A protein has these predicted regions:
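Canonical tetratricopeptide repeat
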Residues: 81, 149, 186, 220, ...
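Alpha-helical adaptor scaffolds
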Residues: 115-119, 149-217
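Register position in tetratricopeptide repeats
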Residues: 54, 88, 121-122, 156-157, ...
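Helix-start (N-cap) detector for alpha-helical repeat units in TPR-like alpha-solenoids
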Residues: 42-43, 76-77, 109, 144-145, ...
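Short coil turns that delineate tetratricopeptide repeat
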Residues: 39-40, 73, 104-107, 140-142, ...
Length: 266
């Protein structure tokens, strides 16, 4: 079974890499985070892992980043992402240690990414993270991963929305490999947080159209309907998410919570 899964994974990697734009297939010049690998398979795994992570499909993203290290063990960025996705454990500590060691000699933005290990939970966490992202954005404003986190860590929802709208237009215009789905998703949640419910739903609709094969887009629409207490539609979208990825913990938990709530009302 494991051999079959790995074979299917590799097939999907090359299918993705063949459809990527020329810009994605070459390492760009500039002070970008140095994620990339000279190994073609490792590089495709990293790019796909980034795409999945940005779309909050972390269960799958973890597999891609972990597999990238099988082809290139020097990828500090993969260790960073695996550490971020791991609970406190020896495994998390191992990934942090490897990232700190492997980033030596890399550019400033790569080292700043690793420095987030030292931005510990506590008061003003968002502001402290934004300070680092702001420095990274100042160094390389064209870095789309950097720009996204620079945007979503801004102080207010209004500021985050405004900056994400700027990024959305950039992504639409240059066909960046990360796409626009993750931006549409976040704009949906942020607008809902401000009470702009119609606008939020429109963004979630756009997200599904932009990424119809993903599972998080349907989970997000399920959240919209759940927050509106339209539980039948919520269950429908959570199930659509599970149809695309049966191990999605968010949809599994949300379906359980809604069913428990409905049972309590009977």
């Amino acid at each position: 079974m494991r051999k079959l899964f790995f074979t299917l994974l590799i097939i999907s990697i090359f299918a993705v890499s063949c459809t990527q734009s020329d810009n994605a297939s070459q390492v760009p010049e500039g002070e970008y985070i140095q994620w990339r690998s000279e190994n073609e398979t490792a590089d495709a795994l990293v790019l796909k892992g980034m795409f999945l992570y940005m779309n909050v499909e972390q269960e799958m993203a973890y597999t891609y980043f972990k597999s990238s290290l099988d082809f290139d063990s020097t990828l500090f960025g993969s260790h960073v992402m695996l550490a971020w996705m791991s609970p406190p454990s020896e495994v998390k500590d191992m990934h942090q240690k490897n990232a700190r060691e492997l980033v030596k000699g890399k550019n400033e933005n790569s080292n700043l990414l690793v420095s987030f290990f030292d931005v510990l939970p506590g008061d003003d966490l968002r502001a402290r993270r934004h300070k680092v992202w702001s420095k990274m954005y100042e160094i390389e404003p064209d870095g789309r991963f950097i720009h996204y986190y620079y945007a979503i860590t801004k102080p207010t929802l209004e500021e985050r929305i405004s900056e994400l709208e700027v990024l959305l237009e950039r992504q639409k215009n240059d066909n960046n490999f990360l796409g626009v789905g993750h931006i549409l998703n976040r704009l949906g949640y942020f607008n809902y947080g401000l009470g702009n419910k119609a606008k939020a739903k429109n963004y979630f609709d756009q997200y599904i159209k932009a990424y119809p094969d993903g599972y998080n887009a349907y989970d997000s629409m399920g959240d919209y309907y759940s927050n509106e207490k339209d539980y039948e539609n919520a269950l429908s979208y959570y199930q659509k998410s599970l149809d695309r990825y049966p191990a999605n913990r968010s949809s599994i938990n949300n379906i359980r919570e809604i069913n428990d709530l409905k049972a309590g009302e009977e």
